[in-house]
């Protein structure tokens, strides 16, 4: 496996692989790799001949007061993990490499952004101003640097997954977006690099997120057609955790990410929650197909 630190080196390797007739896959990550990331890598290895994993803690997707400075970083550990999986390249650029004009005194950048509108109005986007603009901008840069045929993302970050699908469609990228189901701990908690912030009591209570989205799925599959009823089922589960500070519990259309009041048979919806335990913010969700109306 090659460790590549510059865009030029990454593009050169991608061009060489393409010249050999290989298909290319990209797995973008923030690093601090866990089993959830490795599921994405394994999927990429099945999708393409040549796999690149990017490791880059992107500053533009973190807002004021968020955990950019404290976000876990373990470049050498990530390198060893990826080498063991026979990944072809690890692309780990510096901030200066990805945002070359950030410190330009005359005209500091970036001046060019990629922004997918409307899809960031609810869920996480309503509370993390500028987050998804940072995500779509850096992913566009990674697409240009790594030149993939396939890009693999986790469906745990459901809003991001839907937004990136629309990004590729609207900007005519010849790239397939592949979504991988959420990887969970044995007790259901979605795997996340931020789980390590939790103290033992918070970690025990954090399972209410999975309980909440499971309750939403059961309510919908059981015939509940009022979004209010589904949200109520989630809130009942979240209330079992005394230290949980619920940011949102919502049901939206899975494609438009707009809120729904009444669930329509055949519609795909997304039930999602975001919860703080102290300073640690966790998310979870489930995509659910609304069943046919019962006769």
From Swiss-Prot:
It holds the Pfam family Pantoate_ligase. (R)-pantoate binds at residues 61, 160. It catalyses: (R)-pantoate + beta-alanine + ATP = (R)-pantothenate + AMP + diphosphate + H(+). Transmembrane segments: none annotated. The keyword Ligase applies. Keywords: ATP-binding, Cytoplasm, Ligase, Nucleotide-binding, Pantothenate biosynthesis. One of its GO terms (cellular component) is cytosol. Beta-alanine binds at residue 61. GO terms for biological process: pantothenate biosynthetic process. ATP binds at residues 154-157, 183, 191-194. Pathway: Cofactor biosynthesis; (R)-pantothenate biosynthesis; (R)-pantothenate from (R)-pantoate and beta-alanine: step 1/1. Its EC number is 6.3.2.1. It comes from the Bacteria. Belongs to the pantothenate synthetase family. This is Pantothenate synthetase.
